[in-house]
Regions:
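Glycine-rich ThDP/TPP pyrophosphate-binding loop and its adjacent helix/strand module
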Residues: 1-81, 251, 259, 265-276
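Thiamine diphosphate
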Residues: 76-276
Length: 276
């Protein structure tokens, strides 16, 4: 009930993100072989319950160790009731969508295209590259064209849009700000992992194309999210600039020495590096 209440509140909130914190108990209801509580014990995290601990735990939770996967009658009843509720909700939403589609055929066709997962159509001949320009400047030229031609694209940067040159995209749109979501650029602040999570979440929802930029060395902060995105094969775009071993006055803290090897070794992540 508390989870449902939190989700309902989150869905009603239209102006700001909602953080739901679920406090759990490790090994809830588990008992050791001697019958003492196994709750909140570190061992339950990495090892399965076995022997008498397994038997005691199943009994403690109201089940039969000889037939542990039986679904309780009250659970069956709860799920059956919820299934009927969901059928009604789905029918109402499908009817509402059908009415909307009938009244908005052009928008409906556009929505279908955006949610199809197909690559957007881009006229790359519109990209103008200057000879000898830095790779991040070349990226900015491409992003500017994408901002103009891909209306469902969102680009983000971790407080570095003027340096990683994702501002090539920003200059053709405006930032998303509180109370105004009409822009297509998300200024994430110094929060690389959060930025990655949000862009990946957008891609999982569907309907948008998400890309984000920061210095290559800061890919370290994003690594857990990048790895999961790669394993899940989510086509989100990571733009990492300043990828040379020497990055001038910023010094060793900003020099990506080992990051390239880490990223190239990551399974299912496609790497494209423009270098001479």
């Amino acid at each position: 009930a508390q989870i449902r209440e939190a989700l309902d509140a989150a869905q009603k909130e239209q102006d700001r993100p909602t953080l739901i914190i679920g406090k759990t108990v490790m090994g809830k209801g588990a008992l050791r072989a001697d019958g003492t509580s196994y709750e909140a014990c570190i061992n339950t995290h990495g090892a399965p319950l076995g022997g008498d601990a397994y038997v005691n735990t199943i009994k403690h939770l109201g089940g039969d160790p000889e037939n542990a996967f039986v679904i309780f009658d009250d659970v069956k009843e709860l799920y059956a009731k919820r299934a009927e509720e969901l059928k009604k909700i789905v029918a109402e939403r499908k009817a509402a969508e059908a009415e909307w589609r009938k009244a908005n055929p052009e928008k409906a066709a556009l929505m279908d295209e955006w949610f199809s997962g197909k690559a957007p159509k881009v006229d790359w001949s519109k990209v103008e590259q200057k000879a000898g320009s830095a790779t991040r400047a070349a990226s900015a030229a491409c992003l500017g064209v994408l901002a103009e031609q891909v209306p469902n694209m969102i680009c983000a940067s971790a407080d570095l849009s003027n340096s990683d040159k994702t501002d090539g995209f920003l200059k053709k749109t405006k930032s998303i700000v509180r109370g105004d979501f009409s822009g297509a650029f998300f200024q994430a602040g110094v929060a690389e992992l959060t930025m990655a999570d949000m862009c990946i979440g957008m891609m999982l929802h569907g309907g948008v194309v998400a890309a984000m930029g920061t210095f290559f060395v800061f890919s370290d902060y994003m690594k857990p999210a990048v790895r999961l995105a790669a394993l899940m094969q989510i086509p989100v775009k990571f733009i990492w600039t300043h990828d040379a071993f020497r990055v001038g006055e910023d010094g060793p803290t900003h020099e990506p020495v080992e990051q390239e090897a880490q990223i190239r070794l990551m399974e299912k992540l496609k790497n494209h590096a423009g270098k001479d």
